[in-house]
Amino acid sequence: IIGGDECNINEHRFLVALYTSRSRTLFCGGTLINQEWVLTAAHCDRKNFRIKLGMHSKKVPNEDEQTRVPKEKFFCLSSKNYTLWDKDIMLIRLDSPVKNSKHIAPFSLPSSPPSVGSVCRIMGWGRISPTEGTYPDVPHCVNINLLEYEMCRAPYPEFELPATSRTLCAGILEGGKDTCKGDSGGPLICNGQFQGIASWGDDPCAQPHKPAAYTKVFDHLDWIENIIAGNTDASCPP
């Protein structure tokens, strides 16, 4: 997270960290949506990874920290055919449920769609310098704004983004506040509702007029609820 500060230890009980089993490198975030399921970005998938819940400092563990591995992973269309503007979403079923504790609690899915102009909070253990690989020990948090989708389309002509998309655009037009490498998969929380999953942005991060894109959770609710209910062949929104 660029331009933020250390998150309050009590404000991110739903935030999970994905890290490689071998090198213990933290590579993505995610959001606990109930005792057994985590929502993150499809591009965060790896062969072997673990999920750390209830974590704040990487060096000093919380007493209620928990580790899980994926029992099942679900992708929209049950394939990995996500593109920059579509289907960058993955549902992970944990190998065993977690109980709520001091630093662990799920975040409910959104009850209404987000509105442009909302203030949104982003969080994660990703880079805190736009260009250097400086990673913090604790998660950083910052507020950004939900922008018109066109504001993510115009600055990136090379991506040939479609006119409409199940993607949210969020950032600060003057730059300086943004998600960055390592924050992918983490939540975008607008007006207190979980509305987006960090998907992609510019490199270097936080440049003026180069906001980032977030997968729109609201558009995928039916798919999410179906998968959790056991309808594993549920189709993704077209």
From Swiss-Prot:
Family per record: Belongs to the peptidase S1 family. Snake venom subfamily.
Disulfide bonds: 7-141, 28-44, 76-236, 120-190, 152-169, 180-205
Other notes: Negative results: does not have effect on potassium channels and L-type calcium channels in vascular smooth muscle cells.
SUPFAM superfamilies: Trypsin-like serine proteases
Compartments (UniProt record): Secreted
Tissue: Expressed by the venom gland.
Top-level taxonomy: Eukaryota, Metazoa, Chordata, Craniata, Vertebrata
SMART domains linked: Tryp_SPc
Gene3D superfamilies listed in its UniProt record: Trypsin-like serine proteases
Function noted in UniProt: Thrombin-like enzyme that shows fibrinogenolytic activity against both the Aalpha (FGA) and Bbeta (FGB) chains of bovine fibrinogen. This enzyme has poor esterolytic activity upon BAEE substrate. It induces mouse thoracic aortic ring contraction with EC(50)=147 nmol/L. It shows vasoconstrictor effects that are independent of the enzymatic activity, but related to the release of calcium ions form the calcium store, potentially through the activation of ryanodine receptors.
Post-translational modification summary for this protein: N-glycosylated at Asn-81 by a disaccharide composed of two N-acetylglucosamine (NAG). The presence of this N-glycan deforms the enzyme and Removing the carbohydrate moiety increases the esterase activity, but induces a complete loss of contractile response on mouse thoracic aorta.
Native source organism of the sequence: Gloydius halys (Chinese water mocassin)
Name listed for the protein in its UniProt record: Thrombin-like enzyme AhV_TL-I
Single annotated GO MF: toxin activity
